[in-house]
């Protein structure tokens, strides 16, 4: 497989099954534009999408209940979907399957750290030189629940860092713990968060990251955190 030229420079949403996938619905309802939407596994049964990433073999869903609640949804998708569904093995029971270009991706990106399906999707975006990647429903951990976490967060954040290093714009759903996005602004920089006047990170007018003491921009932060209320007259 060769890189898909039409993806170069485009804006792509990757939507997983974590809690912050609701932010995707909110973004769509507010007119946020995506050139393509890539669904992770059974999310494809719920939202419109252009591509599915399912790195498990289809037999996991057809021949076992190992996927739990995803099993029936994935069976339905696999039986009827035209594709592309990127996976590790073709199966005659699912006509939409396409082999993931793992040889090309590993060779061209010189990296084999791929321990979950989302990481494969991000690597595919990097390989295809996507311009902007927006992450929804990719959370792994949840604030307030110290006893639950899914494996794979480190791998996903590693690939997002590689994307940023290559010049790709990366955005994460506001409610997601990925890249510490949902952490309060004054808690993002470890150590400084313990100070009476903590350091905070903001974007300047050129959209570059700047670091200030909270006291320097207190009013601006508070104003941005206030909800915007609209009445029936849009005022």
Identify the meaning behind each predicted range.
Residues 1-235:
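Metal-ion/cofactor- or nucleotide/acyl-coenzyme-handling active-site neighborhoods
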């Amino acid at each position: 497989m060769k890189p898909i030229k039409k993806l170069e420079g485009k804006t792509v949403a990757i939507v997983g099954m974590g809690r912050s996938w609701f932010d995707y619905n909110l973004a769509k309802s507010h007119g946020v534009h995506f050139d393509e939407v890539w669904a992770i596994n059974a999310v494809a049964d719920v939202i419109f999408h252009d591509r599915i990433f399912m790195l498990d073999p289809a037999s996991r869903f057809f021949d076992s209940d190992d996927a739990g609640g995803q099993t029936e949804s994935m069976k339905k998708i696999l039986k009827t979907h035209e594709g592309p569904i990127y996976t590790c093995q073709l199966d005659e029971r699912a006509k939409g399957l396409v082999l993931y270009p793992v040889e090309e991706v590993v060779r061209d990106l010189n990296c084999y750290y791929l321990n979950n399906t989302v990481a494969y999707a991000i690597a595919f975006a990097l390989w295809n030189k996507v311009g902007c990647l927006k992450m929804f429903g990719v959370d792994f951990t949840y604030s307030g629940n110290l006893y639950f976490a899914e494996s794979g967060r480190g791998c996903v954040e590693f690939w997002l860092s590689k994307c940023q290093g290559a010049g790709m714009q990366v955005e994460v759903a506001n409610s997601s713990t990925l890249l510490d996005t949902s952490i309060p602004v004054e808690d993002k920089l470890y150590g400084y968060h313990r100070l009476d006047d903590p350091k905070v990170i903001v974007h300047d007018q050129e959209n570059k990251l700047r670091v200030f003491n909270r006291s320097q921009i207190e009013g601006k932060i508070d104003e941005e955190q206030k909800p915007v209320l609209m009445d029936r007259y849009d005022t």
